Amino acid sequence: MYTSPVIGGLLFALVMLFLKITNLATITLDTTLQNLFMTTFFASVGFTASFKILKNGGIKVAMFLGIAILLIISQDIVGATLAKVFQLNPLLGLCTGSISMIGGHGTAGSFGPLLEELGVSGATTVSFASATFGLVMGSFIGGFVAKGLIDNYKLKTPKESHDKSIPLSDFHEDNQAVLCQKRLMKGSAFLFLSMGIGSVISGFIQDTGLTFPSYIGAMIAAAVIRNFCDIRKIEIEEKEIEVIGNISLGYFLCIALMGLKLWELFDLALPLVVMLVAQSLLMAIFAYFITFRAMGKDYDAAVFASASCGFGMGATPNAVANMDALSAKFGFAATPYFVVPIVGALFVDFVNSAVITLFINILM
């Protein structure tokens, strides 16, 4: 259930951990290409956003956002409650809650220093360590949850339906696919065009003072280009764009996971380890019993459940990696591929920041 980049990246992180512990060497990674690969992948996702998919995914966006809000609140309640049980500052519990789980390293870097200013010692370290833990666990939990749902509920998958109109994500295993330089060049051109226009869009967004992921501009531009081409009946090299996007996702995840500082987890005291395990159990139970049922109890819902594990314990790319692993084995689910990045990029950061701020004021 796990993609090769995830396994390879984690193995390299373990090697770095060994070198760190034994003081044999210190490796510093150059992650210059990480954002490029991330932007390329999400631009490819934007090209799937035709009006037809938007129409089908409209209500799903609202539903998935509602589920994400409930998850945010649940994570913060669990974190603060367990902190009180261990006689720790409940604000420190928030560092193992949505600050680091659904917020990831970005939110951890924002709220950690703020909590330290409020007198919570070690908040930044705990936030980053928890986010690192979540990044690792989100990938593992997502696979187990989805496999359990598909097996236990005997869900019908696209590959089982033998419906040739349903695209399969794992294009590189399509034995009938023909590699064509012209189509690859056109697909690359569409991606580069969307990324160029997207950089301008992202610049305008930054000028407003709002905080968005760097890839959102490229994804919006790609969606506009896709729908313009649909209206003008201009052919889009969908398969080639998808392949380039999936390759970029693999490289991005590998680089990101290679840079994990696993030794940061050693600095966590037993109470914090217990809180992180509790967050992992919460995520698995939440995805299995709430996300799956709320999103329709079908194959798409299982993909949503798997994505929510990566999304709820790390970052949107982790969620997409979980979906990609499922799509490669069982078939493509179009709606989750569009809904999850949109919710993760456009809405969750705002809601999460508001909920965290509310909890901070309540617990102070």
Question: Over which residues does each language-model region extend?
Answer:
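Structural signature of multi-pass alpha-helical membrane transport proteins
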Residues: 1-31, 47-50, 170-173, 185-240, ...
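Entry/N-cap segments of selected transmembrane alpha helices
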Residues: 36-39, 51-80, 188, 258-288
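Transmembrane alpha-helix boundary signature
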Residues: 17-28, 46-57, 77-90, 231-232, ...
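Small-residue-rich segments of transmembrane alpha-helices in multi-pass membrane proteins
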Residues: 6-16, 65-77, 98-103, 223, ...
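Hydrophobic alpha-helical transmembrane segments in multi-pass integral membrane proteins
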Residues: 17-21, 76-84, 109-115, 251-264, ...
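Alpha-helical membrane segments and immediately flanking helix-loop junctions
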Residues: 82-126, 133, 145, 298-347
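Structural signature of hydrophobic alpha-helical transmembrane segments
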Residues: 28-42, 91-98, 209-221, 244-245, ...
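Intrinsically disordered, low-complexity non-transmembrane regions of multi-pass membrane transporters
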Residues: 147-188, 230-235
